[in-house]
Amino acid sequence: MRERASTGRIYIQHVDHCNSHSAFNSKLATIRQSNLCLEITLPTKPLNNIDDKNGEIALCTLSALNLGLINDLHDLKELSTLSVRALDEILEYQNYPVVCAKKSAISRRSLGIGVINFAYYLAKNKVRYSDGSAKNLTHKTFEAIQYYLLKASCELAKEKGSCSLFNQTNYYLGKFPIDTYKKDIDSICNEPLHLNWNLLRKKIKKYGLRNSTLSALMPSETSSQISNATNGIEPPRGFISIKSSKDGMLRQVVPEYKKLKSEYELLWEIPNNIGYLELVAIMQKFVDQSISANTNYDPKRFLNEKIPMKQLIYDLLVAYKLGIKTLYYQNTRDGAEDNQNLNKSIENIKEDNCTSG
C-alpha cells in the first residue's frame, strides 16, 4: 500500500471476486490475471513456446457507448445490438500472429463494451458521485446495458450459433452476474430489477450466447477525445482538460459547460472515495468482466497533509466488501491548478485550422 501511495501504480486485483462473480465457470476457465488497465478478466494458460497450441493468450475486443447521448434507456437496445454485431464481425477480420491468441479469440469471442461520458450523464440528470443521488440511475442504466448486450448476443447465437467454448461460461449454467454479485451492494442500493431477466434466461438456455463476455469498463482516456466526452466513468479534474500526445496538446471542455457547470462534480470537489466506489460496485453488479476504477486523495484534506495508511486500508476494504474486482490508479492531488481562468480559456479555444465544408 505504501508503494501504491507513493507511485500510484501498484494495481490491485481481487482474484477471488474475479472468479466468484465471473462470466466463466472457474472450474473450467480460471481467471488468473488482468490487463494493464484492469478492466479485462479472461482465462489464460501458460505457453511453452510461441507455437504452443495448448496455451491461451486472452484477447478482448472493445468498444464504448456514449452515455451522454442517451435520453431514454430504451435507446441502449439498438446501440447494444449494433455494438455486439460490429465487434463480433471484427473477430473474423483481425490478423492473429500467435496461434494461442487466435484460438482464444475465436473460441470464446469475448467482447468488452463499456461507456464514456458518465460524468456528463450524471450532470445532465442532476445527480452526483458523492451524495448517493446517482445510485438508482446508475443501477437502472447498467442493468439496461448488460441486459441488452446479452439479448443482442443471444439473438446472434440464434442466427450463427453460440461460441464454441460457451460451455465454459456461467451463462451456460444459467448463472448471470445478477445471481453472483456481492450481496453487500443491496445495503447501499435497493433499486429493483426492471427488465425481464427470466425470459432472457430462458432464451439463453435455448440458444446460448455468441460471446463469452459482453461488458468491461475501460478508462477511455484517449478514445473519449473523439466524441468530446468525459473519460469513461471518471469525474473530470477540471472543466477544461489538457491532453498531450505526439501530435500536440488538446484542450477539451466538458460537454455543455455553460448549461451544466453547476451540475458537474469535479474530481477534487468529491470529499472522499466512498460515493465513487459505491457507484463502481453497483456497475460491477451487472458488468461481467471488470472496471478500471481509481482511488483519489487530496493531501490537504488530512492532518499535516499526509494521507494516513488507515484511510488507504479503509478504502481498499470498502472496495473488497462491495465486490469491486480491480483498482487501477491511486491519484494524489499535486497542487497544480485544475481550473484555469475558465471564461477566458473557453473563449480562446478555437478551431484555428478548421475549414468549412
Language-model segment annotations:
Residues 38-44, 87, 91-92, 190-194, ...:
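Catalytic alpha/beta core of large soluble enzyme barrels
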Residues 80-102, 128-220, 292:
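Internal maturation/activation junctions in enzymes
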Residues 49-54, 70-78, 101-113, 125-144, ...:
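Alpha-helix capping and helix-loop boundary segments enriched in small/acidic/polar residues
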Residues 1-5, 66-69, 80-98, 119-126, ...:
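Structural signal for hydrophobic packing residues in well-ordered secondary-structure cores
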Residues 17-19, 142-145, 172, 299-301, ...:
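Acidic, glycine-rich active-site loops and adjacent beta-strand->loop/helix elements
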Residues 26-27, 110-117, 146-148, 175-185, ...:
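Short glycine/threonine-rich loop-to-helix capping motif typified by GTGT followed
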Residues 23, 141, 338-339:
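Short Asp/Glu-rich motifs
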Residues 4-105, 115-125, 229-232, 236-264:
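Function-dense linear segments that define catalytic or interfacial modules
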